[in-house]
Amino acid sequence: MPEGKKLPPAPMLRLLVFAQTGLIVTLLAVVGAYFAPRAGLEDPFLLAFAQGEGADLWELLRPQLLAGLLVGAPGAAVFLAGYYVVFRPWLDDATVVEEVLIRWGLLSLLAWLISLLTPGGGVTATGVWLSILVSGIAFAAGHAPSYAAAGCKLTPRFWTAMLVLNLWVSLYCGWLFWQHGLAAAIVAHMLVHAAWLPLDLRVARRATT
């Protein structure tokens, strides 16, 4: 914050953050709804729900939840091990960017755009993996300015930690979205934060004692 300037009142900041997040989520949700089917990334549960079909929605959702748990639990364990064992000792007071990758919008759009460049205009496995990789890099890099404004030092070590850890989560959550649907990716992503928050609070308490 430049010297002599003050932050807006807390209620105003919360309103601005809420409005910004709502606008981005709405925009990318619309993008995903349009491009996901065109990129071969349809979600059977969301499709049946939106069309009001009489199918058993739980039967469509259950395999996504199971896949999210089976992949998300070991995925979160690797993320936390990488953060606390490898990267956290490097980072001073900085933190790893929280991964909130909007696969439904950004990944679907990238996969569709890449399909336009392939012979016959089809979606390929290589194209989807490239979309997962690029969206993960874009997400990590796009949040760097806000972390810099919060006082984080954007050192090479910070960039390395931010990119490696975000890309790890992006790979398995992107694969879950591609193969099983959005709910599977959401469950896996939630597991990272469900395990990360209490562990990080415990580490922080130890550091202050």
Give a label for each model feature.
Residues 92-209:
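Transmembrane helix-loop-helix hairpins at the membrane interface
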